[in-house]
């Protein structure tokens, strides 16, 4: 997961209060993200799901 610190037009910015980017993967297939977006607190990994978070609000 690449975190973007600059402001290129291609990257969206997270809404106020949700300034972490994240990707969610299934543990059975860690190469294809199931969901991505913005969140306020990085979720904990579970047996089925792995989360990868960034501490920036530039989503890619």
From Swiss-Prot:
Tissue specificity field: Expressed by the venom gland.
Protein family according to the UniProt entry: Belongs to the three-finger toxin family. Short-chain subfamily. Type IA cytotoxin sub-subfamily.
GO molecular function: toxin activity
GO CC field: extracellular region; membrane; other organism cell membrane
Function: Shows cytolytic activity on many different cells by forming pore in lipid membranes. In vivo, increases heart rate or kills the animal by cardiac arrest. In addition, it binds to heparin with high affinity, interacts with Kv channel-interacting protein 1 (KCNIP1) in a calcium-independent manner, and binds to integrin alpha-V/beta-3 (ITGAV/ITGB3) with moderate affinity.
Cell location: Secreted; Target cell membrane
Main location: secreted
Lineage: Eukaryota, Metazoa, Chordata, Craniata, Vertebrata
Subunit structure, as described in the record: Monomer in solution; Homodimer and oligomer in the presence of negatively charged lipids forming a pore with a size ranging between 20 and 30 Angstroms.
Name of the featured protein: Cytotoxin SP13b
Keyword terms, alphabetized: Cardiotoxin, Cytolysis, Disulfide bond, Membrane, Secreted, Target cell membrane, Target membrane, Toxin
Covalent S-S links between cysteines: 3-21, 14-38, 42-53, 54-59
Gene Ontology biological process terms, A to Z: killing of cells of another organism
Source organism of this protein record: Naja atra
